[in-house]
Amino acid sequence: MKKIITLALVGAMLSATGITAFAVDYPGGSQDTEIKTTVAPTFTVSIPADTTVAFNDLTTDFGSVTLDSARLAPNKAVQVTIESDFDLNNSVDNEAVIPYSLTATDGTDEETVDADYAATFRTAGEKTDLKINITQADWDAAAAGDYSDTVTFNIAYVDAAE
């Protein structure tokens, strides 16, 4: 019985050593292997906090829109658009409004924010400063009361303009 078990074990060991594994068929010469990875885009944008405008102030700092951090593809950018009706609405009387405008300053360029406005950022640290503007005539015409408006900041990952 020992001889049969010994022969079986020797046979199993000999057959195991005869197995060769191949990862790639190698015809000779050189072969290339490609290594790939994907790095997903990431970014963080800061927008202005809630702001109170003092009565009779013609210009109030609204804060800034800032691209705090960014890992973008070379041909991409982060775009921020602003939606508002640009009217401060009286909390009691919907007909009573105080019109206002927003001014965006990017470096030395200043423009009035409207429906077509878009700030485009490509590098972390870029920012656009915003100001709220109300004319003295609009303050003088305002009824007493509390006023508010909501400004919506839309943030998108877009193709960069060349």
Predicted segments with their positions:
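Sec-dependent N-terminal signal peptides of Gram-positive bacterial secreted proteins and lipoproteins
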Residues: K2-A23
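Extracellular/luminal ectodomains and secreted, surface-exposed scaffolds of diverse proteins
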Residues: N94-Y117
